[in-house]
Amino acid sequence: MSTQFFSFSDDTPFSTEAVLANASSSHYEEDWPSIPHTHAFTELFYVSEGSGEFLIENQHFSIKKDDLIIVNPHIQHTEISLSASPLSYYTVGVDGISFSFHDQKEFQIFNCRKINTDLLFYFHSLFQELDEKKEGYEEICRHTLSILIAQLRR
């Protein structure tokens, strides 16, 4: 018989005070004005389809499917879709946290094409719970958000 055993301590390397502020799933259509805006929370922006640009503090960045953009609070940004390949994306607003990046910017764009199955799974799970609103969905959403943040901190 082969067995693997794992034990866990009560000490956690970090605690999260993250609170799900809002969440949206969008498909770009011609009526979106792409107006630069800010939020009082951190925004996780995951591109599920299409391509376009992300404007962050007057800098343009190309984005496409399986890119994750993390924007800390109070940073001006907006998305701009390409008509030939319209953007579909998830946004998750998270209160109580902000990220520190190696280059000391207040945002980061990650190419997640190699790890997309893991991150996209958490975004899909979160939105499935929010859509269906089955008993206990709020708790599942909180835990899914905690797992997503732990994955991002790696």
Name what the model sees in each region.
Residues D95-K105:
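Short peripheral tails and domain-boundary helices/loops at the edges of structured domains
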Residues H74-I97:
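Ligand-binding loop in jelly-roll beta-barrel domains
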Residues M1-S62, S83, E106-F110:
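Generic protein-terminus/edge-of-domain signal
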Residues D103-L152:
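Amphipathic alpha-helical segments enriched in hydrophobic/aromatic residues interleaved with Lys/Arg
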Residues N58-P73:
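Short acidic-glycine-tyrosine-enriched beta hairpin
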Residues G52, H74-Q76, K133:
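Short beta->alpha connector loops
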Residues E43, E79, E129:
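Acidic-residue sensor for enzyme active/binding pockets
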